[in-house]
């Protein structure tokens, strides 16, 4: 990279390298430690607005972008807009050692963000059949806004995409998604692996009163997903990562991951996520399904803890997990207060089936109405619990327990039972 590294004094828009999915950048780019300043792309209808708009089987490394201003419709970031594929084969792209500082990246708006998806600091969108690996990257003191799938490092990974993010960090970058999936590291990714990442920026998901954008199907899920590391995901594994930023949203809000909700019609289904060796110290709050590590998912959690205060304005709040139809939680601990209108637990608001082993709660648990327990507010019929302990007070109006507020579904017993 030549030592010509800013747009100072030029008022025009940058035209991205790799103008479209048909003509992507393919190859190796080494920024050699240089910094590009004052990059500007201000087209509200742009897709792929970024230094590299569309890339395919590329390696991009060792580059810093500072004081960029990028506005468009979707697949936006400072480094790579969209990672694409050709011919249906699995293609790999690698982004390493890139930094974005003091920049603003946002989807189009007329004073208020109205639409736009896949907005990130390092990469915007990952297409199907793409394996993207982002390593040793960071965003610092930035503002990233959009409607759907907005993340500090990566915005969104589509179905059949595979994303690995390792050793990457969000430092004081504010991330906001007005409809779905805001994350300190990734907004949403289909198949996701995260290792040794951190966030201390504030994360804001949708408000409960936010109406869906007009370009979504009528049966779409919205107002879901906000997380310190990931807003939402398909199948995901998150290891050795931590959040210290505040996270707020409507449904499915967590210190590590928000929600893996797939659908609520005709039945409710979740994807699986595993969280290991992770921690949260940020305050987590929202309307429902709020957890210190995970808001709602089919969850496996191991050797992880929460130190932030957890609050659900409505129901399902837990020091580790808000709600899961199926969960296995082992060697976890909660150290702060958990509050909900109903269904609050030191470890989980509610789990329908699964197991808890060697878990500890030291935070006060309170339900303004019903179902509060030192471990779980309300448990289903098929839950095993061993070597768990609660050392904090439990309060509420009904269905309270030192370990579990209530166990089992209501049944009418007959003589045949």
PLM regions with names:
Residues 1-417:
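Surface-exposed repetitive/solenoidal architectures
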